[in-house]
Amino acid sequence: MSSEAESRLLADLAPIQALRKSSGDYSESGSHASFFLQAGQLVPAVRLLFEQGYFLEDIAGVDVAEGILIVYHFDRYDASGRVALRLTVPYAAKKAPSIAAIFSGADWHERECCDFFGVEFENHPDLKPLLLPDDLGIHPLLKDKDRKSLFSLLPLRQMVDGKT
């Protein structure tokens, strides 16, 4: 990433820089910036990315020891700047805010995450099952045992001091 592109990325994300956990080496992490957010921080951060011209690439879920890790990837066409927003949803709550009102493409991603992990997205316009039968009664990507901690999945330096 050129210094000009990095400067632009930093300027675009200035309002949420305090939340930033890593500035990435794209070749290692696949992202130029990574953020671990609380549920209340997600919608404002996503709205900022939308206003700065980012688009939603995907939403993925991972069952880890701390809960369901939801990873949101954003990018833009006019400059390098892939951003990852991460939100850990506790097993007890299994609720996350929906971003479908900001990025309509999130609709299907959130429905898929609900199907496979049981996460309910609050304020989602229509959280009916996307791929699985309505009456299945299980969430097939939840693990029964051997959940790994976030610390074992991500390099510790990426989670703590912002270096990748």
What residue spans do the PLM features occupy?
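Terminal low-complexity/charged segments
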Residues: 1-164
